[in-house]
């Protein structure tokens, strides 16, 4: 069960860091209607 907790913490931390970077500097991606 510890593996599940560690995975959850890892995903949570990565998500927070990703959001922090995204909100810190606006995404300048020249992708208009391209995904």
From Swiss-Prot:
Swiss-Prot/TrEMBL keywords: Chloroplast, Membrane, Photosynthesis, Photosystem II, Plastid, Thylakoid, Transmembrane, Transmembrane helix
Record's function text: Found at the monomer-monomer interface of the photosystem II (PS II) dimer, plays a role in assembly and dimerization of PSII. PSII is a light-driven water plastoquinone oxidoreductase, using light energy to abstract electrons from H(2)O, generating a proton gradient subsequently used for ATP formation.
Cellular component, GO annotation: chloroplast thylakoid membrane; photosystem II reaction center
Compartment(s) where it occurs, according to its Swiss-Prot or TrEMBL record: Plastid, Chloroplast thylakoid membrane
Oligomeric and partner information: PSII is composed of 1 copy each of membrane proteins PsbA, PsbB, PsbC, PsbD, PsbE, PsbF, PsbH, PsbI, PsbJ, PsbK, PsbL, PsbM, PsbT, PsbY, PsbZ, Psb30/Ycf12, at least 3 peripheral proteins of the oxygen-evolving complex and a large number of cofactors. It forms dimeric complexes.
Annotated protein name in UniProt: Photosystem II reaction center protein T
Transmembrane segments: 3-23
Disulfide bonds: none
Gene Ontology BP terms: photosynthesis
Membrane topology, from the record: Single-pass membrane protein
Family: Belongs to the PsbT family.
